[in-house]
């Protein structure tokens, strides 16, 4: 009798293990930047942003794995929007302007000098323009996890250029 109960308990434990394994999820994350370390050991900050999300999911121990496809290895940069709206791609880090062929309004987010610094980026994210942009994004079934703005957008050898003067 004891052996029979032990066998049932073992069978139930194995079944529960198999069921919990069946719920493990792998999310696909795509971006265009290198996923390899530079000579100084650092990584591209946009890759690091996606890697932080993957690392935090792993630390949370919630049976969700984030598989990162860097360097255009899954989708080309301007091809990522459509797969995100159809569920073929779970996460991406890309300039929103790359989806402008679907939503021309997105091009406004890539204008050089739009965001001057981090403080301005926080304020800009609450602007009427960005509220409308976020509505378009949400209506497409995409959720923004993080806004990443890079100040400037102009090139100079001597200083950061923040305006057209």
Task: State what each model feature region is.
Residues 1-9:
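Bacterial N-terminal signal peptides that target proteins for export
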Residues 9-17:
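Bacterial N-terminal signal peptides
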Residues 17-24:
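Sec/Tat signal peptide C-region and signal peptidase I cleavage site
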Residues 25-27, 165:
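Nucleotide donor/acceptor-binding cores
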Residues 26, 63-67:
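Residues at or immediately flanking beta-strands
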Residues 28-50, 71-75:
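Extracytoplasmic "Venus flytrap"
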Residues 51-58, 63, 85, 90, ...:
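Contiguous mixed-secondary-structure segments that line small-molecule binding/active-site clefts
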Residues 67-82:
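Short helix-initiation/N-cap motifs at beta->coil->alpha
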């Amino acid at each position: 009798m004891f052996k029979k109960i032990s066998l049932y308990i073992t069978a139930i434990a194995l079944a529960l293990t198999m069921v919990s394994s069946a719920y493990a999820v792998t999310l696909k994350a795509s971006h265009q930047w290198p996923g390899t370390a530079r000579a100084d050991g650092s990584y591209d900050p946009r890759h690091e942003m996606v890697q932080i999300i993957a690392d935090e999911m792993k630390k949370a121990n919630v049976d969700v794995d984030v598989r990162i496809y860097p360097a255009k290895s899954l989708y080309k940069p301007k091809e990522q929007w459509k797969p995100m709206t159809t569920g073929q791609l779970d996460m991406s880090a890309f300039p929103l302007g790359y989806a402008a062929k679907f939503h021309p309004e997105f091009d406004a987010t890539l204008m050089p000098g739009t965001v001057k610094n981090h403080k301005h980026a926080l304020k800009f994210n609450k602007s009427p323009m960005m509220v409308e942009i976020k509505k378009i994004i949400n209506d497409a079934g995409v959720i923004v996890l993080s806004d990443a703005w890079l100040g400037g957008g102009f090139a100079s050898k001597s200083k950061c250029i923040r305006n057209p003067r």
